[in-house]
Amino acid sequence: NETIDYIKSIRDPLADHCPTEYIVKPLTDYEFYAYNFDIIQHNRKYRGQYNIPGQRNTTSYFLITTFKCIALLLAKQRNFFNTQYYAWVDLGCNHVLKNVQECAPAILDNPQPKISACYIHYRSKEELADLATFFKDGGPCGMAATFFTAEATYIDRFYNAMMEIFNEQLCKQLGHSDEQVMTYCYDRYPDLFTIYNGEYYSILTNYHQPKT
């Protein structure tokens, strides 16, 4: 409740120009979270890289980040604003993304086709060939999922591809966050994506053309 009240205090004054629909439901009430939580908890008992004290990558973190593709699917199905494009933006992205006020409107005015995301550290097919080897030290950097846009006609396939890879990782007692899932998703289904390059600070600034 504290979060929704805070968000409304920011969004509601902009209602004439930026209408907002709110879906208020605890993440723990979604089947995706409830069903997979115990599986991931069990898996991590057997993987040393996930048993380091103080590590931020908890079971909830893996599920919360991967939920992004489900949230996009739900938004597309409800289609509140009859739009052809959607965007995911991490709450609190200002701590890492540059020039949000300048770049975000330009992106919304001219979105890239397909699933458009920033690839930070390219991973070859050889690097991705064996899941256990790729995840042996945790979650290597690949694609960024802090912000990306999605053309509506690609969201169903993107969701299914992400869930396929997420479930494969769970089956092999692995998994770190959505960014590793998306890295494998691009490797296997590159036709779903419009890729650009950069690093975390330039995810927005490089969306239309490289600046860093």
Residue ranges and their predicted role:
Residues 60, 64-118:
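GT-A fold catalytic core of metal-dependent nucleotide-sugar glycosyltransferases
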